[in-house]
Amino acid sequence: DPTGDQISAFYCITMLMSLINVDFAVWAPYGDRIAKRLKLLGRTIGADGLLEPLELFGPPNVKAWRLCWNVFATACRMLKLVDAETLVMYAEMIEQYANDFGQACWALIYQVEARTRLEHTVRVKRRGADEKELAIRNGQVHSFDPASPWQWVFDELVGRGESDWWRKELEYKCFMVKTKVRELGEYIEG
């Protein structure tokens, strides 16, 4: 379960800032016991064109990610933002990517997943609001609910609505890394 501080911060993030993101480098089980940040290692191309180690912060593998996700999902359910079934589907999707592409692509998988929550959810939410407005003008209905937008957003993320996002940002890049056409560092940004 999230700590009191975590749920309070999450409430402010979701209700006041209209975001649905937390940093899994610090948002983890037993948040009040966190003494140091979780580290994730990747590689980047240096100014000389050679690969250099890159230290990113976040869960070092999908198992650690799932522990952080479970705290996030509990907070989402506590605040009635997203239903349990959709949150489980999202977690299983990320775990499937990790299983399909392996630890070699974990830094990229986590980067895309974190950016999805930080940046892409806002775009999806905006799209939902725009589609709803257009539907109303045309005398149609739309399932986006401005009073409770995050359910629709996560439904889109785990459904066909955002499959192109995952294909472009994650699947294609992981495939390029796994087939050794590209280096992981070409896609990882600090």
Model-assigned labels for residue ranges:
Residues D1-E189:
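Short, low-complexity/basic segments of RNA/nucleic acid-handling proteins
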